[in-house]
């Protein structure tokens, strides 16, 4: 299947944020998340495929202790590498953690097994907003593991107030020459600002978004993709667009940096558990997914990695610092206005490319 993906920087950013995560986890003292779920024992083993260091320090060992199922984990460095592997006939993996946009593609390629929700009772712990997904209606093939957002990154000392709308970037001259925007993905942000879907392929809506960006272009210092965060860090701009996980790292180094998801909403990424269609131990894979969705285990993983969990029962157990960190949790009303970047199809991608070319040439 030819890929006509919405050209979000998400796959590359995902890899970058996990590379940072791998380094930070290695530097963190080991924490035990042991949780006994009762006398559940079983035979067999699981092979897991995920980003490096993307569970708690003892999550898999604790699962083995409670279930009797041993788990071996292999790691990939990019989502494209993962997709190539799972597309092969001899990968032998039973469970994977994958970015939502690749979940959508694997569903289309019939690479994933239908989940049996009766084997995942802890699905009841999820926030209702995560019980369904536009890229996987009914959660038939995926369960959410961790999530995050894209929003406005800003230098606090340069702004008179915390930005609450994409308009400060897209429809204002207040910070002329001090704005960095993420290239073609800016079309989606303009659509959100105008009240449309980030994934719209409606010609009239795209024309309006393009016209907005052409008017704003003279006030933008650079269209640079994820490098906008570096410009912000270096003091070259005061406003940029970034993923919350990367901005959180920057905020730890510079307390003058802030982050806000606008009231119009933004992009929401998810990483999900899936079971490959060729899995040899789907029952064990279901048990591991359910284990990760347990309230105490979900809380331990989320606080260890400092990423947002879709697990409402887990959030209730987390520290106040975590729960009140708006870089992680922008608020449920804002989350409801966020959406993932989807595959737009060849015609939709071609139309958006044409609109963006006009913006670039203006």
Positions of predicted regions on the chain:
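A bilobed periplasmic-binding-protein/Venus flytrap-type ligand-binding module shared by bacterial periplasmic
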Residues: 151-158, 193-195, 269-284, 289, ...
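Extracytoplasmic ligand-binding site segments that recognize negatively charged/polar headgroups
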Residues: 97-219, 224-233
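N-terminal twin-arginine translocation
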Residues: 13-22, 28-44
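N-terminal secretory signal peptides
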Residues: 1-16
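Mature extracytoplasmic/periplasmic domains
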Residues: 276-336
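Early extracytoplasmic/lumenal segment of secretory-pathway proteins
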Residues: 39-105
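Periplasmic-binding protein-like
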Residues: 148, 206-215, 251-277
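A ligand-binding cleft/hinge motif common to bilobed small-molecule-binding domains
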Residues: 102-107, 233, 239-256
């Amino acid at each position: 299947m030819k890929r006509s993906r919405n050209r979000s920087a998400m796959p590359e950013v995902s890899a970058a944020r996990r590379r940072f995560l791998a380094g930070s986890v290695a530097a963190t003292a080991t924490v035990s998340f042991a949780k006994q779920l009762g006398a559940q024992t079983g035979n067999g083993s699981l092979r897991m495929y995920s980003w490096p260091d993307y569970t708690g320090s003892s999550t898999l060992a604790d699962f083995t202790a409670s279930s009797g199922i041993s788990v071996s984990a292999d790691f990939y460095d990019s989502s494209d590498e993962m997709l190539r592997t799972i597309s092969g006939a001899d990968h032998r993996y039973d469970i994977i953690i994958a970015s939502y946009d690749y979940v959508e593609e694997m569903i289309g390629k019939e690479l994933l097994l239908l989940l049996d929700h009766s084997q995942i009772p802890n699905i009841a712990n999820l926030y209702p907003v995560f019980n369904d997904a536009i890229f996987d209606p009914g959660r038939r093939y995926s369960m959410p593991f961790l999530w995050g957002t894209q929003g406005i990154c800003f230098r606090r000392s340069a702004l008179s107030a915390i930005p609450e709308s994409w308009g400060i970037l897209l429809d204002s001259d207040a910070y002329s020459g001090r704005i960095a925007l993420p290239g073609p993905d800016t079309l989606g942000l303009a659509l959100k600002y105008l009240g449309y879907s980030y994934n719209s392929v409606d010609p009239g809506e795209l024309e309006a978004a393009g016209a907005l960006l052409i008017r704003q272009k003279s006030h933008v210092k650079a269209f640079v993709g994820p490098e906008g965060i570096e410009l912000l860090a270096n003091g070259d701009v005061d406003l940029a667009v970034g993923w919350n996980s990367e901005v959180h790292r920057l905020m730890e180094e510079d307390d003058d940096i802030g982050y806000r998801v606008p009231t119009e909403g933004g992009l929401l990424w998810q990483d999900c558990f899936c079971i490959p269609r060729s899995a040899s131990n789907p029952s064990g894979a279901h048990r591991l997914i359910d284990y990760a969705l347990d309230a105490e285990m979900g809380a331990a993983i989320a606080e260890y990695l400092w990423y947002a969990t879709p697990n409402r029962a887990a959030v209730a157990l987390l520290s106040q610092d975590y729960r009140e960190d708006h870089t992680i949790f922008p608020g449920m009303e804002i989350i409801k206005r966020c959406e993932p970047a989807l595959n737009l199809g060849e015609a939709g991608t071609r139309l958006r490319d044409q609109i963006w070319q006009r913006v670039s040439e203006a």
